[in-house]
UniProtKB/Swiss-Prot annotation:
Coiled coil: none annotated. It holds the Pfam family IreB. This is UPF0297 protein Moth_1643. HAMAP family: UPF0297.
Length: 83
């Protein structure tokens, strides 16, 4: 037992892979459409309020969209629109 205290243990935190906003929006749109929601209206509700309840949990869409900050989504949409 005393020998166990002499060794340094390593702890690794896995980095969360960077997700592309475009990929997130595409997957969320598909999930919302499959459940019969209007993806534009639901995404607007989410972006304005920050309430993830606007996004269905179908296919993990709600968890997926929470991996991206709302300002990142808006920036990507503006870049795409203004380009």
């Amino acid at each position: 037992m005393p020998g166990d205290m002499q060794e340094t243990m390593m702890f690794k935190v896995e980095k969360e892979e960077k997700v592309r906003v475009r990929d997130v929006l595409t997957e969320v749109q598909a999930a919302l459409t499959e459940k019969g929601y209007d993806p534009i209206n639901q995404l607007i509700g989410y972006l304005l309020s920050g309430d993830p309840a606007y996004i269905t949990s179908h296919k993990g869409a709600r968890n997926l969209i929470r991996r991206v900050e709302r300002d990142e989504i808006l920036a990507e949409l503006l870049k795409s629109y203004l380009a």
